[in-house]
Design a protein with these regions (language model features):
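Terminal substrate-recognition subdomain of acyl/acetyltransferases
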Residues: 2, 83-84, 117-118, 124-184
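A short beta-loop-alpha structural element at the N-terminal edge
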Residues: 4-16
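Hydrophobic alpha-helical core bundles mediating ligand binding, dimerization, or RNAP-core interactions
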Residues: 18-21, 25
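Acetyl-CoA-dependent GNAT
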Residues: 23, 31-80, 87
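Short strand-loop-strand
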Residues: 25-30, 103
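Active-site acidic-Proline motif in GNAT/NAT acetyltransferases
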Residues: 86-88, 92, 121
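Conserved acetyl-CoA-binding loop-helix of GNAT-fold acetyltransferases
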Residues: 91-106, 113, 127-131
Length: 184
């Protein structure tokens, strides 16, 4: 089990997503969204997220800021994944932990495949796709990666519930420390 704890967000936490995406630089936004979103486009994207249909996952730092996020959009028979990790936190496995949690959710939804679409030059996403042994097709500067999912079972459902409970406990501990003040 990874020591990176990934927690699912509720619709009430939508406001916490906006600072995360706004903290992405111009190039990072271009790689994450496929085009260089300005601040208004980022806000519109966050406002359009359908928490009833989709799943949003986050990794929090000790100050309770989102440092990594995954949006899993449920489609007809598949789920599409977008991942972002803030620059100072890359190379630590956050993207892989977010992808693993998204994989588990998509499997438990009963979809047949997890799909990622990105620019071919997005080395981080291409690396994640290869590590997850996704089937990658690159053409005209864009890449699509697919992972066929096995059916959900008791283990996958338990794994998801357990991961969420541990992440909620970790978040509560961090929140308690923030109430106590620095150095506690």
């Amino acid at each position: 089990m990874s020591d990176i704890l990934v927690r699912e967000l509720s619709r009430l936490e939508r406001p916490a997503l906006e600072p995360h995406f706004l903290a992405l630089g111009h190039e990072d936004r271009r790689l994450r969204f496929g085009t260089a979103f300005n601040d208004a486009a980022v806000r519109a994207y966050v406002g359009r997220i359908d928490f009833e249909r989709d799943a949003l996952f986050a990794v929090f730092d000790d100050s309770l800021h989102i440092i990594g996020a995954a949006h899993v959009a449920r489609g007809d028979g598949h789920a599409e994944l977008g991942v972002s990790v803030l620059e100072g936190h890359r190379g630590r496995g956050l993207g892989g932990a977010l992808l693993a949690r998204a994989h588990l959710r998509a499997r438990n939804w009963g979809v047949r495949a997890l799909f990622m679409h990105c620019l071919s030059e997005n080395g981080a996403m291409m690396h994640l796709a290869r590590r997850q042994e996704m089937e990658i097709v690159a053409e005209s500067g864009e890449a699509e990666a697919w992972l066929r999912l096995s059916p959900a079972d008791a283990s996958s459902h338990f794994g998801e519930v357990f991961a969420q409970r541990v992440a909620l406990f970790d978040y509560a501990l961090k929140r308690g420390r923030s109430w106590l003040g620095p150095g506690r």
